[in-house]
Amino acid sequence: MSEVETTNDQTPAPKRKDKKPSRSQLRSASRRLALQAVYQWQMNKTAVSEIETQFVIDQDRDMDSCDKVYFRELLQGVTASAKKLDTLFEELLDRPLSELDPIELAVMRIGSYELSQRLDVPYRVAINESVELAKGFGATESHKYVNGILDKLAQRVRREEIAARREANKESNK
């Protein structure tokens, strides 16, 4: 058996070994599932514990490819502090909160949660992951809107981190 397979264009591609997903891949998957769960909570007002159970039991959802602890933290943290999270970004919006698309709202709540509560997640990662969620699940241009709002929020809640990054960039460009 060969160690090299060919791709559709007949160029050799390294044979894939059963490689475990990286921590960032697991967290990205957790965010995708948390988005779906938060959206369900927003739309149906189903108890969070019931939603979590549905996600764990449902074989169609790939819970094995995510960080279950992080999924649970996002779901529980976002839903428990939704009103507080909304106040963080509401004044940055160009329209009332009630007029936001439900997917955009769920994405912004997750992004706001990570920016304000998960200081171990770099602000650029929190914003980028939210933008990717908006691209994958939101309306055509929603990712641009999400990016703008969360970037402004990061300027407020991660001021020191942003300043340190800018200073480090200045030093490396000398």
From Swiss-Prot:
Function, as annotated: Involved in transcription antitermination. Required for transcription of ribosomal RNA (rRNA) genes. Binds specifically to the boxA antiterminator sequence of the ribosomal RNA (rrn) operons.
GO cellular component: cytosol
A Pfam family annotated for this UniProt entry: NusB
PANTHER family according to UniProt: ANTITERMINATION NUSB DOMAIN-CONTAINING PROTEIN (PTHR11078:SF3), N UTILIZATION SUBSTANCE PROTEIN B-RELATED (PTHR11078)
Listed InterPro entries: NusB-like_sf, NusB_fam, NusB_RsmB_TIM44
MF terms (GO), sorted A to Z: RNA binding
Name of the protein this chain belongs to: Transcription antitermination protein NusB
Region (Disordered): 1-29
One GO-annotated biological process of the protein: DNA-templated transcription termination
Species this chain originates from: Marinomonas sp. (strain MWYL1)
Polar residues bias locations: 1-11
Coiled coil (UniProt feature): none
Record-stated family: Belongs to the NusB family.
UniProt keyword annotations, A-Z: RNA-binding, Transcription, Transcription antitermination, Transcription regulation
